[in-house]
Amino acid sequence: MNETKTDMLNYWIEELLKYFNEIGFEVNPLPKIVLDDTPNPEDELFIKTGYYDPTENKLVLFIDNRHIKDILRTFCHEMVHRNQNIVNPRQFEMSEGDMPLKDAPKLRMIEGEAFLKGNLLFRQFTERFTH
């Protein structure tokens, strides 16, 4: 694992967590955060990016062959899932798991919220440094 990349990720994850706290985005107790450097093919579209496991309160980010910004965007997406699990834990108990989104309206709702909020959180966070 590239120590510089890991150090940078850890730094920015800490900064994002501070930001979440500042804006009142509820994620505590924090999940265990795992940076997984399992090799990902460089030119493969369908690689694993990350996941949140509510039963273990664990968030895994796959970091090999990925830009730091992309990894942090995944982190924000998965932290929205953490927030969803805090605000409405039954949501996860009732979700359709690994079904295709076209067949899983509850999962589609959960994922839609995570994509929308996760990207907005990350954009607003980055704007603190660019505007």
Residue ranges of predicted features:
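Auxiliary, metal-adjacent structural segments of Zn-dependent hydrolase domains
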Residues: 2-58, 120, 124
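Short active-site segment of divalent metal-dependent hydrolases/proteases
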Residues: 76-84
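Post-HEXXH active-site segment of zinc metalloproteases
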Residues: 69-73, 85-116
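Long, well-structured alpha-helical subdomains associated
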Residues: 123-131
